[in-house]
Amino acid sequence: SEMCIRDRLKKLLTVPDTCTSLNDFLKCFTLPDALMMTQEGISEAVYLVAENIRQQGVIYAEIRFAPQNHTENGMSQEEAVQAALEGLKRTELKANIILCCMRGEGNEEANYETLELTKKYLVEDGGVTGMDLAGAEALYPTSKYAALFAKAREYGIPFTIHAGEAAGAESVRCAIEYGASRIGHGVRIREDDSVCELVKNKGIVLEMCPTSNRQTRAVENMKDYP
């Protein structure tokens, strides 16, 4: 029945209470990613996300995604980026796109392609405005990506890095040393006072995600939220 299908879909898309880690949490991305292997899928997803949050009262958003995660059925990273920009054009929300490189094994070439696309499409506003590094932080440490971000700096690309979520404060220090002006999550800076000071002194913006931090067990108790 339709009800039954809806329940099953909800289950596939919802992080269970039994979720124990970021790696567990990331499994919920499998189905949405599968639906975004075409330009129509990506364009529609960007448009729907933007419209949805606009109706909730959000006045500005930076929608981020990893173009390399959408190439399984023959779409190129560049076509994925163009599709996202198409979706962005259709919304009334003031929004930009951030392109994510991914932590992982054997995808170095794909990350450099994302970097080159960020450079090609980079604008001040109304399109691609920066780059990010996302994915399984505990398995693939920030320290592996020095050369990638050296190149981003050389190109003058602004970037943020997911750090201090599944790995400790050292990951945040590393990201800041690479030149990240913002940190995705950063909740574990509280484990090291010197990293807290570094964040404060350099005016690093922390992009906080309290809901997912509870779901991934990056924070057990909201009293401990930095």
Role assignments for model-derived ranges:
Residues 81-90, 96, 109-130, 139-161, ...:
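Histidine/acidic residue-rich metal-binding segments in metalloenzymes
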Residues 12-39, 131:
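Polyampholytic, low-complexity intrinsically disordered segments
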Residues 69-79, 138-142, 177-185, 212:
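Glycine-rich tight-turn/loop motif centered on a GG-T
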Residues 61-63, 131, 183:
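Hydrophobic residues within beta-strands of alpha/beta enzymes
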Residues 66-68, 100-106, 133-138, 162-166, ...:
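Active-site beta-loop-alpha junctions enriched in small/polar residues
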